[in-house]
Amino acid sequence: MFTGIIEDLGKINKLEKDGGNLQITVSTSFTNELKIDQSVAHNGVCLTVVGINGDAYTVTAIQETLDKTNLGNLKENDSLNIER
C-alpha cells in the first residue's frame, strides 16, 4: 500500500522505446529489496517491476500512461520520486 511519502529519489539509467511503450530502467537505494511484479510509484505513477539487474530495475510505461503523465518527458539521468 502506498503511503504518499516519497521514499527515495531514483535516477533514470536508460530509456528504451518498445513499440508504443517505454522501458524505464531506474537505480535506487532499495533495488535489492524489490521483486519482479512488485508495484512501485514513479512520480506518482504506479508501474510494475519487470526486470532487475544489479542496482537497477526496469518498468514499462504504456502509451496511455505516457500520454497522461510526465513520464514521457523524462530523459536519461533525470530523477524520479519513488514510493513503494
Question: What would you call each of these model-derived segments?
Answer:
Residues 1-84:
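Conserved loop->alpha-helix
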